[in-house]
C-alpha cells in the first residue's frame, strides 16, 4: 500500500476508534486468532462431529427435528455440561412444558437454572435480549420457536389471518441478538420444529422449520435431530437410537453425523457411546458377545456392558479420556475434569 493510501486509512481508523471505541476495526494480522470456546453436548460423538468439542460460545444455534426426536433432551444435556463448567444457564419455556424432574435426572442443577414461561413471543425475545445484554449468563435456551406466538395473534380473534408475523418477529429479534451474544460471549439455542411445505413438489426435502428463514441464516450451527430406531429389552421399549446431523457449521466443517442412545427417563447414554466408539477405535475389545477393556471384562452383550460402566464410573472416565486422546479432542470439552482443575 502506498503512503497516501496508508495515511488516509489511518485517519479513517482513528476516526472510527474515536466515534465507536478502540478496536472497532482491526487488521487480522495484528490480532492473534482466538480459539473458539465451546460447551460440551454430553455426547462424545457429537462433540467430535461439531469439530470444536461442543457448541460454540457467543453464537446462535438451532436444534430442530420431528416431535419426540430428542431435541429437548439434547439441550438439557448441554445445560448440564455448561453448569458443570461453572456456567449460568436460562431456559425460556415458551411451550410451558419443562419437566423439572426429568431435567434433574439428566444432571441439570435445577436450583441454579433460571426459567421463564412468557405469555407471547415478543416477551420471550425481550427476556432473551435483556439477560444476554447482562453478560452474566453463558447459555440461553428457547423452547421452542413454534411457540413464540406474536401478541397480535394471541389477542386477535380465532380465525384471524396473521401472515408472516412470526417470521418478521424472529427476523427483527435475530438482527439485534447476533451482535449482543457475540459481544457478551453468550450462546443462544433455539429449539425448532419441522413442518411440511404446502404444495411442495419436485426435488429437495418438503420439510421446513417454523419461524421463517432468518434463523437459518443467523445460526452459526444447525443440528438436525432424528429418531432412527426404538431400543427394546425383552420386547419392551427402553429408549431410542438418535442420529444428529450437523447441517450447518460456521466454525468447523459441516455435514458430520453422530449417533447415540437416548434412554427413557435417563437421557443420553454416555456408556453406550463409550462402547460404540471404544470398539471402533480398538480401545474396547469385542470378542463374540463379550466386551472387555484392558484386562477387565465389561459384560456379555451391549446392555450388560453399559450397566457395568454405569456402576464403575472410574473405568468409564478412563475410556472417555482414551477416546478423546485418540480423536484429538482432549481438553476441548467444557466440563471435563481437566478443565475444572484449571479453573
Swiss-Prot record:
Pfam families: RecA (PF00154), RecA_C (PF21096)
Disulphide connectivity of cysteines: none
GO cellular component: cytosol
Alphabetically ordered keywords of this record: ATP-binding, Cytoplasm, DNA damage, DNA recombination, DNA repair, DNA-binding, Nucleotide-binding, SOS response
Residues involved in ATP binding: 65-72
Protein family: Belongs to the RecA family.
Protein name according to UniProt: Protein RecA
Provenance organism: Campylobacter jejuni subsp. doylei (strain ATCC BAA-1458 / RM4099 / 269.97)
Lineage of origin: Bacteria, Pseudomonadati, Campylobacterota, Epsilonproteobacteria, Campylobacterales
